[in-house]
Amino acid sequence: MVDIDENRLHMAEALVTRYCRESKMNLKVRAFKERRDALEGAEYVICAVKIGGYGPLEKEREIAEARGYYRGIGDRVSCYYGGIGAYHQIHFLEGVARDMQELCPDAWLVQTANPVFEGTNYITRHYNIKAVGVCHGHNAYKEIIEELGLEQDKVNVEVVGFNHCVFMTGFRYKGKDAYPLLDQWIEEKAEAYWKSERYMDPNRVFSKDQMSPGAIEAYRLYGVMPIGDAVRSATPWWTHTDFETKCRWYGKNGGFDSEIGWKSYLDSKKDIQANLSEIVESGRSVMEAYRPSETTEQHIPFIDSIANGVGEDTDPERAE
C-alpha cells in the first residue's frame, strides 16, 4: 500500500495487518511512501487515489456558484471531475502510467479513482500499459429488485454504459422481461413509496435516488432505467435547478448532490476516518467492527479471472 500521508499510511498498515492476523490470512503487508518503491515488479496495481480529497471539486463548485450556477455544476450533477479535479487526477495517473511502463510493464492497473472512464481511456491511449476501469454503480439495480419484491437469484440484468452513466438495457425475471413489473410498480405503488418513511427518512446518509421520481422521469424519457450514479448524471436538467425542485424529484433532502445530501456524504467520510483511527488507537478488534462479508466490488473477481482463469470479461475494449 502507498500513501504520501505518513500518519494515514501507518493507520492503514496497522488496520490491514491486524485484520490479516485476526482472520488468520497469511498475507504480508508492506507500506510505502514512494509509489515507485511499491511498483517495482508488481503484477496488479489498484489505484484509489483522490488528489486533495474533495478539495479541488469544492473549489470548482465555489467558482461556478459565484457565477450563478446552482451547486456549482449546473446540470452536470455527477461528473465529479469536470475541470480542476480532473486535471489533478489525470496528471497523477500519467505519472503512475509512466512508472508502470518502466517498473512493471506487464502489470494490470485496476483503475478505481474518478474520473474512471476518462482516466482509463486517457492512459490506455497514450501509454503502453494494461488497464481496466471499475466502478460499483451498477449494483444499484438491486434496489429495484428489492422494491419490486423479486427473488434476486432469479433476476438477470444487463447494465451498459460508462462510468456514472449506465442504463439497465436488459431486465429479466424467471426468464421473462421484467420491465412490465417495473411499469406496474410505477402505476400502482410508486406514489405510496415516495410518501413512505423508508424513502423520506431525512436521517439516512445516502438518499434513495434509484427509485426516486427523478429516476422514473428519466426512465420515461429514455425508455430504459438509469442505474446508480446515472440517476444523478443522466436525469433531466429540469429536476436539478434549485433545492426546492430537487426535493420534489429526489426526496426530502434533495438527493445525493443537494447541499444537504452532499454534506451528509462528506460528513460520513469524516466519521469513517474517525472510527478507523479509534480502532487503531484502542486496539479494538477490526473484525468485530468490520465483519467479513462477500464484496460486491470487482477488484478481486477481476484479478482472480486473470490469475486463475475464472470466467470474467477482461477485454479492455469492453471494460469500463
What is each stretch, according to the model?
Residues 10, 51-126:
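Rossmann-fold NAD(P)-binding glycine/threonine-rich loop
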Residues 5-41, 48, 53-57, 61:
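Conserved N-terminal Rossmann-fold NAD(P) cofactor-binding segment
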Residues 1-6, 135:
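Conserved acidic E/D residue at the C-terminus of a beta-strand in Rossmann-like folds
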Residues 147-320:
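Long, compositionally biased stretches enriched for glycine and/or charged residues
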Residues 6-14, 90, 117, 138, ...:
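Short, surface-exposed alpha-helical segments at coil->helix boundaries
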Residues 108-177:
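Rossmann-fold dinucleotide-binding core
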Residues 21, 25, 105, 127-128:
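Proline-centered flexible-loop/turn and helix-kink motifs
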Residues 15-19, 96-100, 147:
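A generic secondary-structure signal
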